[in-house]
Design a protein with these regions (language model features):
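P-loop potassium selectivity filter motif centered on the GYG triad
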Residues: 1-22, 88-177
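A conserved hydrophobic secondary-structure block that centers on an alpha-helix together
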Residues: 13-90, 170-188
Length: 188
């Protein structure tokens, strides 16, 4: 149950969209995969030769898997992640002063905001510097838990678990790696 993330979650989507849209899909995606595995196992295990064997009720399976497996484990993982430093808040993005000044170049613009070009058509660059950085915030720990447990690919931040707010310590990294394998190992 992996999915491709072709967007930067921290800048593209609101907290509400991340929570109600993507998190629900992360739970349903994982529950669907597990329910299909259950149906397949029931189909192989059926001893009924008259063609009337049942592989179960998909909606009952989805509900039970979500309520009795995914939600409790995700809750425990989210509490652990928050305790280890994964952010879980609804704060606005924070602008902080950096330790050292960052120097960079940017295109020089005319009065209309269009980039100026030199004789060869290349943009004219000007030196700039900054001493501030904007840090994204948000309810990350709760979404990180189901992302890892359900082996879903899309994270809160574009860098996923490589971002220090999603994976701040080696211990959280270990638990995230183990949580990816928890359900597949339990189903085998």
């Amino acid at each position: 149950n992996t999915n491709w993330q072709a967007y930067a979650g921290e800048s593209t989507m609101s907290y509400l969209t991340q929570m109600l849209g993507l998190t629900v899909q992360n739970f349903l995606s994982a529950a669907t995969g597990i329910a299909v595995a259950f149906a397949l196992a029931r189909g192989f295990a059926a001893r009924n030769t008259d063609g009337q064997g049942s592989v179960g009720n998909f909606w009952v399976d989805i509900t039970r898997i979500t309520a009795w497996l995914l939600l409790p484990i995700s809750f425990v993982l989210a509490m652990f992640f928050a305790g280890q430093g994964v952010i879980q808040n609804f704060d606005a993005y924070k602008t902080v002063t950096t330790v050292e000044t960052l120097a960079y170049q940017q295109p020089k613009n005319d009065a209309d905001g269009q980039p100026l070009k030199d004789a060869t058509g290349a943009p004219v660059m000007e030196d700039a510097s900054t001493t501030t950085q904007t840090l994204a915030m948000g309810p990350v720990a709760s979404q990180e838990a189901i992302k890892m447990l359900g082996t879903n690919g899309g994270g809160f931040f574009n860098a996923n678990s490589a971002h220090p707010f999603e994976n701040p310590t080696p211990f959280t990294n270990l638990i995230q790696m183990l949580s990816i394998f928890l359900i597949p190992a339990g189903l085998t």
